[in-house]
Regions:
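Active-site catalytic motif of lipid deacylating hydrolases and related acyltransferases
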Residues: 2-72
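Serine-dependent carboxylesterase/thioesterase catalytic core
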Residues: 11, 38, 54-157
Length: 220
């Protein structure tokens, strides 16, 4: 199905847009086969919502300049949905975005993330963050910030974000999501985290509770 505007696909946290390892599986190829023009966010894998949102805003401008299109449609997964909302509502991208579709995005955050960040001592958190940041830098991030990325996924941070961001008129926003029915049915590490997340967030995909998925005019 050819679309009027190109599609910008925005990945979630701790992933990159690699040429030979597609984050989105077979979805882009199927869309392109039917005439859709696909672009990728090409943003860092671990950064605050504000920093990632700025990268997405810059990427939108690049796509518009390259294609001559007036707008883009955004499909965003996980934290990418928060990053895209920030770009649209805070950074002036609303006139250039026709629609935003979020997939398993923690719009209301993850209570489990609050619990972990409050439980783990600062010294241990910094050690884990340093290890992740070193790895992510090798994978292509210029300035990875593990703690900023995780911190912005907490329920407390998302409550504040939702108070600050107003969905603009003129951008169609919809959401979708899926949950693991059985922990054994998920891939590592989601099969391990599913039961723990359930204690705090109910039905979930291994990281994000279903109650957080819904945002916008339609939810499926």
């Amino acid at each position: 199905c050819a679309t009027k505007y190109p599609i910008l696909m925005v990945h979630g946290v701790f992933f990159r847009d690699f040429r030979y390892l597609n984050y989105w599986g077979r979805i882009p190829a199927e869309l392109e086969k039917n005439g859709t023009v696909i672009y990728y966010g090409n943003h860092q894998s671990a950064a605050s919502v504000a920093d990632s949102g700025a990268e997405i805003a810059a990427r939108i401008r690049e796509v518009l300049q390259e294609t001559g299109s007036e707008k883009v449609n955004i499909i965003a997964h996980s934290k990418g949905g928060l990053d895209s909302r920030y770009a649209i509502s805070r950074l002036g991208m609303a006139p250039y975005v026709a629609s935003l579709t979020t997939i398993n995005t923690p719009h209301r955050g993850c209570e489990f993330a609050d619990y972990l960040l409050n439980l783990i001592p600062k010294k241990q958190k910094n050690a884990v963050a340093a290890a992740y940041n070193a790895t992510l830098k090798k994978l292509g991030d210029d300035n990875p910030d593990f703690l900023a990325a995780v911190g912005d996924l907490t329920a407390s941070a998302c409550r504040k974000l939702n108070e600050e961001l107003q969905d603009p008129a003129g951008v169609y926003i919809q959401s979708t999501g899926s949950c693991l029915k059985h922990a054994s049915g998920g891939r590592f590490p989601l099969n391990l985290t599913n039961r723990f997340v359930h204690l705090f967030d109910g039905e979930n995909d291994g990281l994000v509770g279903e109650a957080s998925f819904r945002w916008g005019e339609a939810y499926t």
